[in-house]
Regions:
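Juxtamembrane intracellular "pre-TM" segments in multi-pass secondary transporters
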Residues: 3-17, 195-228, 407-416
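Helix-breaking motifs and short loop linkers at transmembrane-helix boundaries and internal kinks
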Residues: 50, 82, 103-108, 283, ...
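Residue-level signature of mid-helix packing/kink "hotspots" within the transmembrane helices
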Residues: 64-72, 156-157, 265-273, 357-358
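Conserved MFS/SLC helix-loop-helix module at the cytosolic interface between two early adjacent transmembrane helices
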Residues: 69-105
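Structural signature of the two symmetry-related core transmembrane helices
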Residues: 85-99, 180, 286-300
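Paired small-residue
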Residues: 108-116, 298, 309-317
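Cytoplasmic helix-loop-helix junction between adjacent transmembrane helices
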Residues: 113-152
C-alpha cells in the first residue's frame, strides 16, 4: 500500500483525496448500522424484553463502557499495525454481534451483544478519525473532521429510517440482521483504505506531553482530557435525545421517530457541508459555545413543549448543536499532540464519547425512570450548562491563544491574541 504524501503547503493540498473519500465511505456505511440500532434497541427493550428507561440506559452504558475499556489498546494497535486493521476488524466484530442480536431472547444476552458492538464501534471510530487527521493538513483538521462527520451523521440519520422500516413494529429479527449486514459491508469497503499515511506536515515532536511513558500516560493523553470532558458533556446531553425520542415521539403522537432522526441528521450534515470551514474561522470557544447552546435549546423545548411541532423544531436545534460540537474539539486535541502520539491522542479523546454515553445512560436514564422521559430531557440541559462552563472558563478562557481562529497554529508559533 503506497503512502499518501504532501507535495506543497496547505494552500496546495487537496483535502478530498481518494483515501479520504474511502475512509468517509467506510464511516458512512458503518454508521448506517449504528443508526439502525438507535430505534431498534430501545423498542426491543421496552417491547419483547419488557423493561423500561433504566434498561435502555443500561444498554447504552454497557456499550460505552466496553468501548472505554478497549480504547487504550486500540490506540496502540493503530500505531503498531496501522489504521486499516481497526476499520476492518471493528466493523466485522460489530456486524457479527448485530446479526447475533437477532437471536436474543434475554436481557443479559442483549447486554453481551451491546458490549461487543461497543468494542467494534470504538475500533472503527479510532481508525477512521485517526486516518482523517493523518490525511488533513494541520491548519485544515477541523475542516477535515467536519467533512468526515458528514458521513457519521449522514449514516446515523439514514439508519433510523431503514431500521424503523425493516422493523415494521415487530420484525426485530429481520431488523437486527439487516443492521449487521451494513457493518459487514463497511468492513469490505475498509479493505481499500490506507494502512498508514505519511505526515502531511513537519511538526515539532516536542509538542508531546512531558508526562512519563507509563501509568496514566499510557491510558489517557493529556491533550485529550479537557477537550474530552467538554465533548462528554455534549454527548451525555445528546444521549437523552437518542434514547428517549423513539418512545417519547409515539407518546406525543408520531407513528415513528425515523423522520425526527432524519431531520436532526440532515440539519447536521448541511451545516457541516456548507459550513465546513466555520470551526476554523470561529475557533473552538465560539464554535463549541454554539454547539452546546443550541443543543440545550433543543432539549429544553422537548422538556417543556410536548407537541409534534416541538419535536421537529427540537430536532433541528439538536442537529445544529451536534454539527459544531465535535470538529473543533478534535482539532484542538490533535494540534496539541505530536505526530507520533496522534493515534493515542485521538483514541483518548474519542473515549469521551463513551464517557458521556455512560453518564447519560446510567444517571440521566435513572433520572428519567423516576420523573418520566419528558422531564428527563432537563438532565441533558444540565449537562450542556456544565460543558459551557468548562469550555469557557477552563479549556479556552477568553484571551487564550486557542480561543480564536488562529488556534490551529498556536502550538507551533508564538501566542496570538484572540479576536
Amino acid at each position: 500500500m503506497s503512502m499518501v504524501t504532501n507535495t506543497g503547503g496547505p494552500a496546495q493540498t487537496t483535502l478530498l483525496t481518494r483515501p479520504f473519500l474511502i475512509v468517509t465511505a467506510t464511516a458512512m456505511v458503518f454508521f448506517v448500522y449504528i443508526g439502525m440500532l438507535i430505534p431498534i434497541v430501545p423498542l426491543f427493550i421496552e417491547g419483547p424484553l419488557g423493561l423500561g428507561e433504566f434498561g435502555i440506559g443500561l444498554t447504552i452504558a454497557v456499550f460505552a463502557a466496553s468501548a472505554i475499556i478497549a480504547r487504550p489498546m486500540l490506540g496502540r494497535l493503530a500505531d503498531r499495525y496501522g489504521r486499516r486493521v481497526l476499520l476492518v476488524g471493528g466493523a466485522s466484530v460489530a456486524g457479527l454481534a448485530g446479526i447475533a442480536s437477532s437471536q436474543v431472547t434475554e436481557f443479559w444476552q442483549l447486554l453481551v451483544m451491546r458490549g461487543i458492538m461497543g468494542v467494534g464501534e470504538a475500533a472503527v471510530f479510532v481508525g477512521a478519525a485517526t486516518l482523517i487527521a493523518d490525511l488533513s493538513p494541520r491548519d485544515r483538521r477541523a475542516e477535515g473532521a467536519s467533512y468526515f462527520s458528514v458521513a457519521v451523521f449522514g449514516g446515523i440519520g439514514i439508519g433510523p429510517i431503514f431500521g424503523e422500516f425493516l422493523l415494521d413494529d415487530t420484525q426485530f429479527e429481520r431488523a437486527f440482521a439487516a443492521a449487521g449486514a451494513f457493518a459487514l459491508l463497511a468492513a469490505v469497503v475498509a479493505l481499500f483504505a490506507p494502512a498508514r499515511v505519511a505526515p502531511l506536515d513537519t511538526v515539532d515532536e516536542t509538542i508531546a506531553s512531558a508526562a512519563p511513558a507509563s501509568g496514566r500516560r499510557k491510558i489517557m493523553h493529556p491533550a485529550a482530557v479537557m477537550p474530552g470532558v467538554v465533548l462528554a458533556s455534549g454527548v451525555a446531553a445528546f444521549s437523552t435525545f437518542g434514547a428517549f425520542i423513539p418512545d417519547y415521539s409515539r407518546e406525543v403522537g408520531l407513528a415513528t421517530s425515523g423522520g425526527l432522526f432524519a431531520a436532526y441528521s440532515l440539519t447536521s450534515v448541511l451545516v457541516r457541508i456548507f459550513g465546513a470551514t466555520l470551526p476554523e474561522r470561529l475557533g473552538p470557544r465560539r464554535a463549541v459555545t454554539i454547539a452546546l447552546g443550541t443543543l440545550m435549546i433543543g432539549l429544553a423545548i422537548l422538556a417543556i413543549v410536548p407537541t409534534v411541532a416541538a419535536l421537529w423544531v427540537a430536532s433541528i436545534f439538536v442537529g445544529i448543536g451536534m454539527a459544531f460540537n465535535y470538529p473543533s474539539l478534535l482539532a484542538l486535541t490533535v494540534n496539541r499532540a505530536s505526530d507520533s502520539d496522534r493515534a493515542w491522542a485521538i483514541s483518548s479523546f474519542t473515549m469521551f464519547f463513551e464517557v458521556g454515553s455512560v453518564f447519560g445512560g446510567l444517571f440521566i436514564g435513572g433520572f428519567a425512570q423516576v420523573v418520566g422521559k419528558q422531564t428527563g430531557f432537563f438532565g441533558g440541559v444540565v449537562c450542556c450548562l456544565v460543558g459551557l462552563y468548562l469550555l469557557r472558563f477552563k479549556l479556552v478562557p477568553a484571551g487564550s491563544p486557542d480561543s480564536g481562529p488562529s488556534y490551529q497554529t498556536a502550538m507551533t508559533q508564538a501566542p496570538v491574541a484572540a479576536d
